[in-house]
Regions:
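Glycine-centered signal
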Residues: 6, 25-26
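Bacterial N-terminal signal peptides
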Residues: 10-23
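Structural preference for beta-rich elements and adjacent junctions enriched in aromatics
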Residues: 27-296
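N-terminal secretory signal peptides that target proteins for export/translocation
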Residues: 1-8
């Protein structure tokens, strides 16, 4: 994969800016403006289109195990948006691609033994609730909701992490001799947010897990002193800002078919023999979801 020199310059500039800040100052009270893109993204898991040069670039720093140090591997993360989607692109380099691990393609099956990349969005910027979108090199989609500022842990539908939550979004990944790559597109119609004076503010955390180093790198800097799930806590997110997004209220239609089969043995009228009666069952229908507004 060829690197864009203007992108590298932007990355180094942002990284230099990050290094002169104290950790407490990185999560600024000021929101960061996300760039709107005008170009077209060929959604194939390789973020190399010209449109990615219009995006906002985010550096990443080690959260664990060696807080605040330089990551063992280079990460280039870009975020932009258009009227329909929030776009996230990541170039996740590896000095030895054989170290890249992906354990599953199954939806919502996340593993700490796998490399992963994802974004946490506190869509109301309330420091309490958030939505998580993750993937692995296999391209698996992993999404869940966070409540109570990530306190209390939890598995599926327990505690503060609800892994049964799903929504509509897409991800594509690719890999080569330099590392692995991610393109995510999240419809704004799949998010709940508020527009105030034409602006939308959300909290954001970026996460990359480098499995062979057992290393978690984040943006912004996340101090592990805040607990095991510190990298999921909305209260530690960086506020980002979008402008002039027109809300969409789409209708999602999911057809379903439910089949079944049962057998009964009944005594005949003469009460001399049991006869088998097969009863196949088939039920079909549609699940329809419609949001009245962007914040309901």
């Amino acid at each position: 994969m060829q690197l864009n020199l203007s992108f590298v310059h932007k990355s180094l500039t942002v990284l230099l800016f990050l290094n002169i800040l104290t950790p407490a100052a990185v999560v600024s009270q000021e929101s960061l403006i996300i760039s709107k893109i005008s170009g077209t993204v060929n959604f194939d898991g390789t973020p190399n289109e010209e449109a990615w040069n219009e995006t906002t670039v985010f550096p990443m720093i080690v959260s664990t195990p060696n807080f605040g140090t330089e990551p063992s591997e280079l990460s280039e993360v870009m975020i932009g948006y258009d009227q329909e989607y929030l776009w996230i692109g990541a170039r996740l380099f590896s000095k030895d691609p054989s170290n890249i691990t992906s354990t599953s393609k199954k939806r919502d099956e996340e593993s700490r033994n796998s490399d992963s990349f994802g974004i946490i969005l506190d869509t109301y910027d309330d420091n309490e609730n958030a939505l998580a979108f993750f993937t692995m090199p296999s391209g698996a989609r992993i999404d869940y909701s966070v409540s109570n500022d990530g306190e209390g842990g939890g598995g599926s539908s327990r505690g503060s992490i609800n892994r049964s939550w799903n929504t509509f979004w897409d991800v594509e990944t690719s890999r080569d001799e330099l590392g692995w790559y991610v393109e995510m597109r999240i419809p704004f119609s799949s998010l709940r947010f508020q527009t105030i004076n034409g602006k939308i503010r959300m909290g954001m955390i970026l996460n990359r897990r480098i499995s062979y180093m057992n290393e978690m790198v984040t943006y912004p800097i996340i101090d592990p002193k805040y607990g095991f799930s510190a990298n999921l806590k909305p209260s530690l997110a960086q506020t980002i800002e979008f402008e002039n997004i027109e809300p969409h209220n789409p209708v999602y239609i999911s057809p379903y078919v439910i089949g079944g089969y049962s057998s009964n043995w009944d005594l005949n009228d003469a009460e001399t023999l049991y006869q088998k009666e097969d009863k196949p069952k088939l039920e079909a229908g549609l699940d329809v979801k419609y949001s009245l507004t962007s914040n309901l």
